[in-house]
Amino acid sequence: GSMKPPVVEIDKLWSVFHEAGRDVVIHQDLDLRIDAGELVSIVGGSGSGKTVLLRQMLGLEVPARGKVTVLGEAAASMGREGAASRVGMLFQHGALYSAFSVLDNIAFALRELKTLPKDLILDVAMVKLRMVGLNPADAHKMPADLSGGMVKRAALARALIMDPPLLLLDEPTAGLDPGSADEFCALLQSLHEELGLTVVMVTHDLDTLLELSTRIAVVADRHIVASGSAAEVMAQPHPFIKEFFLGERGRRASALIQAPLRPPAHLFSDTET
């Protein structure tokens, strides 16, 4: 193991929501450590607070108790600008601003900084547009004219505009047909490797999970009940795990779990002094 500090460290996290006049505890003493270059997939049943964990890492939710540290800093204290340059987030509905062109959507966070000249901002946005496999001709299209896969790509480019070392993905293949989902997975895999990103992904799609993960973490009973390869996770005798991996959709998973997980992305920062 490396002595590098973790990219994400969640320590004894309590997430509590107020509903109908009472406190609902979503996470209780949840611990999770994510190291540089990992692509960790978080799985759990509905109501297990998977997206809440992503929002905690983004600083959009504040821990009721415990600590969420991202790149050495309390997530909740990063502020919007600090967060954008450190953490990119692809929300499930990858909503683009409908009144802006694709290129202007991608450039959005850079524009808000108001520190760069306009032509430079558009140049940077164009580089990101190409990086996610869109064509220069797509730059001036409006979101309404895009396929679902193109919307995801544009939203991904927007999340990566400030070169954050950490990328959060919420159900990245949801709503895509199988062909588009496969293509988007391939894109995520190559970006993870080429950019040396650390990625945290929430998904309930087994193909996406087994294709991309370097590690799988299972949230149940308000904390992480298992973490490791698919085979290691499936060896845990937990009802949710059995249902998830071996239920209806999981019939083929038992064949797939023999497949090893991907290694973490090679980190260029390892060569720095």
Model-identified regions with their sequence ranges:
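Helix-to-loop junction immediately C-terminal to a conserved catalytic motif
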Residues: 58
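Conserved catalytic motifs of ABC-family nucleotide-binding domains
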Residues: 163
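Catalytic Walker B motif of ABC-type/P-loop ATPase nucleotide-binding domains
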Residues: 167-170
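ABC ATPase NBD coupling module
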Residues: 75-88, 112, 119, 233-236
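Conserved ABC ATPase signature
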Residues: 142-146, 150
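Conserved ABC ATPase "signature" region
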Residues: 119-137
